[in-house]
Amino acid sequence: QYQSDFSSYLVGLGTVDGVIYGGANAANLKSIVWYQPAEFEARGYSVPATWDEMIALADQIVADGMTPFCFGMYSNGASGWLATDWMEDIMLRTGEGTATYDKWVSHDIPFNDPVVKNAATFLSQIMHTEGYVVGGTDAIVSTYFGNAQDPMFEKDANGNPGCFMHRQASFITSFWPEAAQAGAGSETTV
């Protein structure tokens, strides 16, 4: 049953010499930017395919008087993982490939390496640009990650969502308001 329920790749991770010794019981996909297609369509926004397009869209959303991103990093004693997820993504896309990323992870290059600093500069575009984040920059570190996306499902007096995009792993749908969970994949998507 296990072999039919999971990809051969996942099965292979727990297999040695043709014998399955262990296996995945869950998987979470990272690097997802969640959005609500209906909200994009209603305003004529296109789904960005590049970082530059995402920044241009964020600028447009701000110019339209709204907030592009929900962003929360508070996670009790483990708050750093949310920024790390962003940094990992950006480094893999803007750095010198997986070899440099692997060096960073194994502490063979320092946090002040130009590749790491470049990734931090990209992330800073989201975190420190006025109007980009619900509650502003200061709210990022005090907003619980599990509630960070809530404004995406709430409307202001003009019928606009509190934010349009939220970057988080696939597990975040279990934190969504109940009505949004029922519509996952249709009301809100990646």
Task: Provide a role label for each language-model segment.
Residues A58, W104-T143, V190:
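Glycine-centered hinge/linker elements that transmit conformational signals in sensory
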Residues D17-V19, I90, T94, W176-V190:
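Ligand-binding "clamshell"
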Residues Q1-F6, L92-N118, Q181-A184:
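Short, solvent-exposed loop/beta-turn-alpha elements that line the ligand-binding surface or hinge
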Residues Q1-S31, I61, L82:
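Hinge/lid segment of periplasmic solute-binding proteins
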Residues C70, C163-Q168:
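Paired acidic/hydrophobic, glycine-rich loop segments that form the ligand-binding mouth/hinge
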Residues G22-N28, R43, F69-A78, Y101-V115, ...:
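Short beta-strand->loop
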Residues Q1-S8, L13-T15, A38-A49, P151-N158, ...:
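Extracytoplasmic "Venus flytrap"/periplasmic binding protein-like
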Residues W51-I55, T137-K155:
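Short helix-initiation/N-cap motifs at beta->coil->alpha
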